[in-house]
């Protein structure tokens, strides 16, 4: 009966946590990675006001709370809050006892060593996990696409990375990080909608803007051409009804918003766009493997969900690459959750079972065991 216990797979992103059971094809729980504590000491004594809220509940009570994002740019920066999020994940979302299941966590590329040790320590000491493993997010996305070699462009809410992977191993010297992702695009959308005279101020409206961004924005194949079309006709205009019944119209903002991924200068950032960052990452790799990378550019994360993004990537990278090079962009439809899906696949492989760090190994070697067993 030993085999019956499913491993737990937790993908903690800057914006959303994805959690579920290994072997499933989608996460059971997806909720915002936020923690909130009351702004004022409880005036209402005995009203059962909790001292902390996590996820959707924190989101809905944000008026009376101070909200914190414990994961910034993909890296955990506040361990107390992170622990609360994990506790909430196990007990409230998945309703499991963590001491009964192996736990697979994901980490950002280039996650500092001390962070990996801290994750390991919390899982074994606070949650008493029987076994644990930590895997790099981009590597899991690549597995989910059925590959072991390729370059992953992983763009979520808080950070974007380009990660070249060869035979299942990420190549750290060639990983590049771009601090431009979904949250920045949402903020940019507010800014350009304000130029149109629509104002959004509260956090509640941040959710609305995110919804507008996800439903109406797209990436243009040729930015100048799209701008011209937009200025000459209203063919590109779409309307959106706000919760209060007000209808707003959005035109060139639809493609100007995600254009910032290719032209960060629109946000006032001196950085390369995602196409150039991908190219630069490939150029940092050995000559012999570049062909395999150009032929397997895998998109992952919520910010790669815009329609038109793969055609545009194809066009931009083909322009940068050597002329004879075959460039292939892979954009799986489930890429919003492909990190989690890759984790679910990995943790349920029979060959992976000897890779877990067991509680016994942890007790013998301490947190540094993670560097020997997970790479």
Curated annotation (Swiss-Prot):
Subcellular location, principal: cytoplasm
Top EC class of this enzyme: hydrolase
Chemical reaction(s) catalysed: ATP + H2O = ADP + phosphate + H(+)
EC number: 3.6.4.-
Gene Ontology MF, one: hydrolase activity
Reported function: Actins are highly conserved proteins that are involved in various types of cell motility and are ubiquitously expressed in all eukaryotic cells.
Family in the record: Belongs to the actin family.
Keywords, in A-Z order: ATP-binding, Cytoplasm, Cytoskeleton, Hydrolase, Nucleotide-binding
Pfam families recorded: Actin
Annotated protein name in UniProt: Actin
Compartments (UniProt record): Cytoplasm, Cytoskeleton
GO cellular component: cytoplasm; cytoskeleton
């Amino acid at each position: 009966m030993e085999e019956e216990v499913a491993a737990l797979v937790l993908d903690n992103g800057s914006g959303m946590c994805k959690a579920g059971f290994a072997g499933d094809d989608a996460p059971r729980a997806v909720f915002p990675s936020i923690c909130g504590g009351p702004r004022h000491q409880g005036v209402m004594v005995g009203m059962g006001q909790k001292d902390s809220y996590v996820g959707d509940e924190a989101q809905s009570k944000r008026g009376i709370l101070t909200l914190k994002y414990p994961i910034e740019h993909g890296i955990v920066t506040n361990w107390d809050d992170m622990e609360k999020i994990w506790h909430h994940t196990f007990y409230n979302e998945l309703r499991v006892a963590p001491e009964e299941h192996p736990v697979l966590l994901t980490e950002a590329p280039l996650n500092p060593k001390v962070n990996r040790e801290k994750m390991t320590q919390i899982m074994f000491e606070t949650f008493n996990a029987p076994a644990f493993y930590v895997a790099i997010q981009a590597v899991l996305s690549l597995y989910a696409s059925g590959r072991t070699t390729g370059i992953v462009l992983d763009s979520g809410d808080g950070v974007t990375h380009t990660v070249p992977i060869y035979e299942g191993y990420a190549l750290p010297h060639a990983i590049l990080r771009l601090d431009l992702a979904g949250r920045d695009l949402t903020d940019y959308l507010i800014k350009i909608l304000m130029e149109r005279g629509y104002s959004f101020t509260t956090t509640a409206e941040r959710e609305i803007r995110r919804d507008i961004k996800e439903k109406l924005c797209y990436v243009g194949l040729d930015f100048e051409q799209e701008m011209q079309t937009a200025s000459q006709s209203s063919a590109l205009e779409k309307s959106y009804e706000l919760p209060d019944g007000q209808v707003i119209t959005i035109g060139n903002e639809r493609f100007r918003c995600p254009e910032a991924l290719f032209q960060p200068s629109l946000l006032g950032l001196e950085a390369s766009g995602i196409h150039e960052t991908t190219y630069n990452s490939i150029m940092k790799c050995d000559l012999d493997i570049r062909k395999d990378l150009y032929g397997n550019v895998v998109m992952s994360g919520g910010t790669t969900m815009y329609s038109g993004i793969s055609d545009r990537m194809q066009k931009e990278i083909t322009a940068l690459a050597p002329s004879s090079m075959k460039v292939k962009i892979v954009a799986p439809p489930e890429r919003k959750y492909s990190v989690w899906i890759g984790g679910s696949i990995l943790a349920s492989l029979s060959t992976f079972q000897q890779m877990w760090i067991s509680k016994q190994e942890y007790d013998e070697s301490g947190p540094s065991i993670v560097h020997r067993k997970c790479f």
